[in-house]
Amino acid sequence: MVTSNVVLVSGEGERFTVDKKIAERSLLLKNYLNDMHDSNLQNNSDSESDSDSETNHKSKDNNNGDDDDEDDDEIVMPVPNVRSSVLQKVIEWAEHHRDSNFPDEDDDDSRKSAPVDSWDREFLKVDQEMLYEIILAANYLNIKPLLDAGCKVVAEMIRGRSPEEIRRTFNIVNDFTPEEEAAIRRENEWAEDR
C-alpha cells in the first residue's frame, strides 16, 4: 500500500492533510510512517488474501480527483502538543522546504555555523509567543533545521544586549537581590564587552 497523504491532528483536534513528503520533514513523523509501513508489510504477509480488507489507516471521502494507481488512504497522526495555528506554521515551513537539503544533522559545527536562511528569517518574524511555540513544536516533531533557525533567531535577539535589555525583551522578572546581582556581575566580568 502506498500512502500519499498524512493527516496531522492538532491539540485542538483540527485536521491538516499533508503530502507524505511534507510530513517526512519531521523525523518523528518519518519514523512513525516507517513503523506503520513496516507494520503493514508484516500484516500483509500474514494475511495476503485480505488485500481489500480494512486497515489501520483512515480514509477520507474527498479524493482530490487523483485516480492514480496509488491508494488514497491516509495515516492519521495526532500531534497533541501543538496548537493548530502553530502546526499550520510548521506545515508552511515544511512545504517551503519540501526539496531543501540541510547540513547533516550529526555535523553540529556546520549546523551551528550556517546562517539563518533569509526566507526562514522572514518566516520567523512572528510574535515571541508564536516563535517559542514554533521552536517547541520543531523540537517535539524533531525538525532540526527549523529548531536551529528558531534558536538562532532567539540568539540574535539576545546578542549584544545587557541583562536589563534582555529582561525587557523577554519579560523576565529580575528576582536577584542587588547583592546577588553584583556578585554575579563580578563573577562574569570576563564576558562583558568583548
Curated annotation (Swiss-Prot):
Region (Interaction with the F-box domain of F-box proteins): 135-194
Any one GO cellular component localisation term in the record: cytoplasm
Cellular compartments annotated: Cytoplasm; Nucleus; Chromosome, Centromere, Kinetochore
Biased composition range(s): Basic and acidic residues: 54-63
UniProt pathway: Protein modification; protein ubiquitination
Entry keyword annotation includes tRNA processing: no
Any one GO biological process: G2/M transition of mitotic cell cycle
Listed Acidic residues bias regions: 64-75
Sample GO molecular function, one term: cullin family protein binding
CDD domains tied to this protein: BTB_POZ_SKP1
Region of interest called Disordered, as start-end residue ranges on this chain: 38-79
Main location: cytoplasm
Modification sites for Phosphothreonine: 177
InterPro entries in UniProt: SKP1, SKP1-like, SKP1-like_dim_sf, SKP1/BTB/POZ_sf, Skp1_comp_dimer, Skp1_comp_POZ
Alphabetized UniProt keyword annotations: Centromere, Chromosome, Cytoplasm, DNA-binding, Kinetochore, Nucleus, Phosphoprotein, Ubl conjugation pathway
Keyword DNA-binding among record annotations: yes
Reported function: Essential component of the E3 ubiquitin ligase complex SCF (SKP1-CUL1-F-box protein) ubiquitin ligase complex, which mediates the ubiquitination and subsequent proteasomal degradation of target proteins like phosphorylated SIC1. Participates in the attachment of chromosomes to the spindle. Acts as a regulatory component of the centromere DNA-binding protein complex CBF3, which is essential for chromosome segregation and movement of centromeres along microtubules. CBF3 is required for the recruitment of other kinetochore complexes to CEN DNA.
Family label: Belongs to the SKP1 family.
Complex formation: Component of the E3 ubiquitin ligase complexes SCF with HRT1, some cullins like CDC53, and some F-box proteins like MET30 CDC4 and SAF1. Interacts with CDC53 and MET30 to form the E3 ubiquitin ligase complex SCF(Met30) which also contains MET4. Forms complex SCF(Cdc4) together with CDC4 and CDC53. Component of the CBF3 complex, which is formed of CBF3A/CBF2, CBF3B/CEP3, CBF3C/CTF13 and CBF3D. Component of the RAVE complex composed of RAV1, RAV2 and SKP1/CBF3D. Interacts with RCY1, ROY1, CBF3D and SGT1.
Annotated protein name in UniProt: Suppressor of kinetochore protein 1
Species annotation: Saccharomyces cerevisiae (strain ATCC 204508 / S288c)
Annotated gene: SKP1
